Curated annotation (Swiss-Prot):
Alphabetized HAMAP family for the sequence: Rib_5P_isom_A (MF_00170)
E.C. code: 5.3.1.6
Origin species: Caulobacter vibrioides (strain NA1000 / CB15N) (Caulobacter crescentus)
Biological processes, Gene Ontology terms: D-ribose metabolic process; pentose-phosphate shunt, non-oxidative branch
Name under which the protein is recorded: Ribose-5-phosphate isomerase A
Residues forming the catalytic site: 103 (proton acceptor)
Length: 227
């Protein structure tokens, strides 16, 4: 089974968790897109989707899913989103799609969070996938210097500003992304705290103690994982 098929079946399994009347957080990325498509196909009544990016909002509108802003709901019943890595205890690296801030805001407003992924996303330790760090544009070079100091404290390479063909990658919120490649993050909790202490850092892609369940697509079907 291809990785894309594994993503599809995990998204379809997650769509079965949604019930009529729910407020649903809609994740961002290729795996989350499969969930959004499967959710639309179910034709549930009175659901509202809270998108985590402009791209997800556009897809949901195209498929006819009613949307709500996060500020217009008191609680999100269920959020389904992908991940770049799934480590021990359902610790996650997210943000490869440059939507980590809005994703984390929706996750933290949710009663239940389910991560979906293909089998390759499961890892024994976080860090092979570059850790995204969202920073404000003003003074970002100096913020990068401070991030490099933190990286050195954790025996990690210095982060690099994420760029694309047209220049710097800019998030939906107008911020920039630095990626901290490592190979292995020995202490994700300590690193998360250190990154958040830097003025200019909006947030980072370490999602710790947030996922309630993972649905991982494999060649044998969907595997359910608990923290």
């Amino acid at each position: 089974m291809s990785a894309d098929d594994q993503k599809r079946i995990s998204g379809e399994a997650a769509a079965e968790l949604v019930e009529n009347g729910m407020v649903v957080g809609l994740g961002t990325g290729s795996t989350a897109a499969w969930f959004v498509k499967a959710l639309a196909a179910r034709g549930l009544k009175d659901i509202r989707g809270v998108p985590t990016s402009d791209a997800t909002a556009a897809l949901a509108r195209e498929l006819g899913i009613p949307l709500a802003a996060l500020d217009d709901v008191k609680t999100v019943d269920l959020t389904v989103d992908g991940a770049d890595e799934i480590g021990p205890g359902l610790s996650l690296i997210k943000g490869g799609g440059a939507a980590l801030l809005r994703e984390k805001l929706v996750w933290e407003a949710s009663t239940r969070c389910v991560v979906i992924a293909d089998a390759a996303k499961r890892v024994p330790a976080l860090g092979k996938f570059p850790l995204p760090i969202e920073v404000v544009r003003f003074g970002h070079v100096h913020t990068g210097y401070r991030l490099a100091d933190i990286a050195a404290e954790f025996d990690l390479p210095p982060p690099r500003l994420r760029t694309a063909e047209r220049g710097m990658v800019v998030t939906d919120g107008g911020n920039l992304i630095y990626d901290m490649a490592s190979g292995k993050i020995e202490d994700p909790t300590a690193l998360a705290a250190a990154l958040k202490s830097v003025t200019g850092v909006v947030d980072h892609g370490l999602f710790l103690d947030l996922a309630d369940e993972a649905l991982v697509g494999t060649d044998e079907g969907v595997v359910r994982l608990q923290p």
